[in-house]
UniProtKB/Swiss-Prot annotation:
The modification Methionine (R)-sulfoxide is found at M45, M48. The modification N-acetylglutamate is found at E3. It comes from Homo sapiens (Human). Pfam families: Actin. One of its GO terms (molecular function) is hydrolase activity. It is found in: Cytoplasm, Cytoskeleton. This is Actin, gamma-enteric smooth muscle. In the intestine, abundantly expressed in smooth muscle cells of muscularis mucosa and muscularis propria. Also detected in intestinal vascular smooth muscle cells. Oxidation of Met-45 and Met-48 by MICALs (MICAL1, MICAL2 or MICAL3) to form methionine sulfoxide promotes actin filament depolymerization. MICAL1 and MICAL2 produce the (R)-S-oxide form. The (R)-S-oxide form is reverted by MSRB1 and MSRB2, which promotes actin repolymerization. Monomethylation at Lys-85 (K84me1) regulates actin-myosin interaction and actomyosin-dependent processes. Demethylation by ALKBH4 is required for maintaining actomyosin dynamics supporting normal cleavage furrow ingression during cytokinesis and cell migration. It comes from the Eukaryota. The keyword Acetylation applies. Its EC number is 3.6.4.-.
Length: 376
């Protein structure tokens, strides 16, 4: 336990899940939903010790009586009071540490507004009194976790998808692509197409069931048209799923129609390019001399890249777009669901990183704007 006295904390705040733990560990200790719930009704049972707000798993389990809010929308923090509750929950309830004793590494979405980084810095030093902190870009951490400093990361989570080209450890902001299409939208789309099949999923509780179906049964087809033909002519692609009440439902072409939306956003009425095209467009916005390195280092990260078949499909689609002689490699690490956190854990435990922290005295002298000078 002596070790943990000065260990840095790493907190990766995603739109869907918050991942928190100690630098140097190979996986986060705590993973919980980024939600804050408040009671919808006045408590009637006296002395029940009802709280005015619940965070994470507890909010999820009591969702029937709560109004749930996600403080992080599309990767960017929009509700600071709720965000403070999530950080408080991470430190005190999940990790059981006193933040004033640990340097803390936070993550941010690519192209996070400047005011947001300052606000994060301010809350860490003034509300939680951390001795030191740092803010790192999520996609850059994923790249570190894969053992690279140059490459293009496709980071797709619950709320947002980004393509981030990185050269020698620096993200190239002019070429970053953002797509507001991610896990939550795919869950919604799966709810919609299952409803068309005659199964009814409407409430937030049922939405969690659909998310589970999505995570267990969906996959990306290598050739969508062929797969649709196979599904129509045989039942080889059908799988059954048992609902919590014991009812069994059968799911067929929905298994690959759902994630196909990533490649064809028009499925949900979005006028946007698919993830293969945004990857290509992002590479084309980079300097001609580094494109070769980016094509050869396509790193997938985030929970929405966990579909079986996604790497092969990306390989096929990007090969079709790129020059014919180009070597294209898609890297899909098995732990990519948590690779942002893992990259943070690696970074915060490097000896060379220790002078990069923003310390409390530096903050007191310069104020929140110091984050732009020290974290880039």
């Amino acid at each position: 336990m002596c070790e943990e006295e000065t260990t840095a904390l790493v907190c990766d705040n995603g739109s869907g899940l918050c991942k928190a733990g100690f630098a140097g560990d190979d996986a986060p200790r705590a993973v919980f939903p980024s939600i804050v719930g408040r009671p919808r009704h006045q408590g009637v049972m006296v002395g029940m010790g009802q709280k005015d707000s619940y965070v994470g798993d507890e909010a999820q389990s009591k969702r029937g009586i709560l109004t749930l809010k996600y403080p992080i929308e599309h990767g960017i923090i929009t509700n600071w009071d709720d965000m403070e509750k999530i950080w408080h929950h991470s430190f005190y309830n999940e990790l059981r540490v006193a933040p004033e004793e640990h340097p803390t590494l936070l993550t941010e979405a690519p192209l996070n507004p400047k005011a947001n980084r300052e606000k994060m810095t301010q809350i860490m030093f003034e509300t939680f009194n951390v001795p030191a902190m740092y803010v790192a870009i999520q996609a850059v951490l994923s790249l570190y976790a894969s053992g690279r400093t140059t490459g293009i990361v496709l980071d797709s989570g619950d709320g947002v998808t980004h393509n981030v080209p990185i050269y020698e450890g620096y993200a190239l902001p002019h070429a970053i692509m953002r797509l507001d299409l991610a896990g939550r939208d795919l869950t919604d789309y799966l709810m919609k197409i299952l409803t068309e099949r005659g199964y009814s999923f409407v409430t937030t509780a049922e939405r969690e069931i659909v998310r589970d179906i999505k995570e267990k049964l969906c996959y990306v087809a290598l050739d969508f048209e062929n797969e649709m033909a196979t599904a129509a002519s045989s039942s080889s692609l059908e799988k059954s799923y048992e609902l919590p009440d014991g009812q069994v439902i059968t799911i067929g072409n929905e298994r690959f129609r759902c994630p196909e939306t990533l490649f064809q956003p028009s499925f949900i009425g979005m006028e946007s390019a698919g993830i293969h095209e945004t990857t290509y467009n992002s590479i084309m916005k980079c300097d001609i001399d580094i494109r070769k390195d980016l094509y050869a280092n396509n790193v997938l990260s985030g929970g929405t890249t966990m579909y079986p078949g996604i790497a092969d499909r990306m390989q096929k689609e990007i090969t079709a777009l790129a020059p014919s002689t180009m070597k294209i490699k898609i890297i899909a690490p098995p732990e990519r669901k948590y690779s942002v956190w893992i990259g943070g854990s690696i970074l915060a435990s490097l000896s060379t990183f220790q002078q990069m922290w923003i310390s409390k005295p530096e903050y007191d002298e310069a104020g929140p704007s110091i984050v732009h000078r020290k974290c880039f």
